[in-house]
Amino acid sequence: MSLELRLALQEQRSADLEQRLRRLLGPFTSTEAVLDAGCGTGSVAFALAPYVAEVVGIDIRADYLEAARAAAPANVRFEEADVTSLPFGYAEFDLVCCHRVLHHVRRPELAVSELARVARSGDKIFIADQLGSVDPLLSLEMDRFERLRDATHQRLLPDGDIRGYLDANDLLLLSSEVTREQVDLEERLELAGFSEEERVRIRGPAPANPYEIEVGWYVARKPGQ
């Protein structure tokens, strides 16, 4: 995803995201150390910063991190790192977040395992992502379309896969919900800077314009005190 599109989406979603995170993850005590894994340009980090002690954001995209650092408040810092191999010790964070990242990850099960590893016992892990279909043919078609639109796309995970990864790491699911979003394809193509030739190629397998996606929101707890 281009930096320009990422920043535009962050601006569009920021108010709703902050409200949703406060509802799903609060109340906060202002003492929490938070990890935003796959932070992009900092949407989750910036939403949580006023309510916690510290947020560390990690991403593999240097351009995203540069943009995030330019806007970061004093209690937020960013590091270049891979969500499947986090550069942190066991149980370092009170809250671990992974927002719209797993569909970009080749081995999402490793990412969830790392999220669980760095979370403190008794504390929360938050995952949100666009969901895939349980129908394998529909899922393949949607993944094909998403890869044309965003070369970093790997695979949309069905709800059951995400629940399975949480289960495999002995994480207790506290809450989950699914929301629906309308996506304006032409607006996304414009913001991403595609040429007209590229736009024609992407429009071909597009489900519709606008089209609807489902986003799953999961809050889990790591066992222990």
What are these regions (language model features)?
Residues 97:
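A conserved beta-strand element that flanks and buttresses the S-adenosyl-L-methionine
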Residues 1-38, 43-47, 63-67, 71, 126-148, ...:
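Conserved class I S-adenosyl-L-methionine
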Residues 109-121:
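A short glycine-rich, Lys/Arg-flanked "PGG" loop and its adjoining helix->strand segment in the class I
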Residues 41-85:
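Class I SAM-dependent methyltransferase SAM/SAH-binding core
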Residues 154-170:
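Short alpha-helix
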Residues 172-225:
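Conserved Class I S-adenosyl-L-methionine
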